[in-house]
A protein has these predicted regions:
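Extended catalytic cores of very large enzyme megasubunits
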Residues: 1-206
Length: 206
């Protein structure tokens, strides 16, 4: 019987269950000021791993927390609703939400495109990444922090931004329908050039 292909992910830092089990969290405030003391940004009672510096906290909260469109929850994790029964929306308030939307979205697309050998391997992949993000062992580039998971976790869309993707079913280049279901989460691109400084096909053509 042929062995199923796909990635097999061995756990190094986590055990099945809660990937954040050994991480201590604390509530902090993030405040960024100008040299004259005027406040540029401030957000209180945000949840951050206790090992993070204040600089890392400020970057995470001010730059990478989604500031709108996120379902708000109570202390027990229950979604809050207003008097009309509509879900109360607001910002992300915990770095755990950010780690979750990144790792769970990566896992989702990996499973959807057949990357993993088993569901257990997909879960290991997700859990290990959550732990590595929370402990600062790994971090993606800024477009990932900004965009990844906003549609998958929060159903956010937004107007199309001119992004294109290859439809895996048809193999054809297809325009994206909105901002976040297939976002542009990359900051750098590799382009082929000749080893030449000034002539055609060289670095100046970029």
């Amino acid at each position: 019987m042929a062995q199923k292909s796909g990635l097999k992910v061995t756990r190094k830092y986590t055990t099945p269950g809660n990937p954040y089990n050994n991480i201590e969290w604390e509530k902090r405030s993030s405040k960024i000021t100008n040299p004259d003391g005027s406040v540029v940004f401030e957000m209180n009672d945000v949840e951050i791993p206790s090992t993070w510096s204040q600089v890392a906290t400020d970057i995470m909260v001010s730059k990478y927390f989604r500031k709108a469109g996120v379902p708000q929850t109570d202390a027990d994790g229950n979604v809050l609703k207003d008097e009309n029964g509509d879900v109360v929306l607001g910002p992300e308030t915990s770095s755990r939400q950010v780690f979750d939307r990144l790792a769970e979205t990566w896992r989702h697309w990996g499973e959807k495109t057949g990357y993993f050998a088993t569901k257990a391997d997909a879960q290991s992949f997700e859990d290990e990444l959550k732990y590595m993000l929370a402990t600062q062992m790994a971090a993606p580039n800024s477009p990932q922090w900004f965009n990844t998971g906003l549609n998958f976790k929060y159903d956010l869309t937004g107007p199309a931004q001119g992004f294109w993707y290859v439809d895996p079913k048809t193999g054809k280049l297809t325009p994206g329908e909105d901002s976040y279901s297939r976002p542009q989460p990359h900051a750098c691109f590799i382009q082929s050039i000749d080893d030449d400084l000034v002539n055609e096909g060289g670095i100046m053509d970029l």
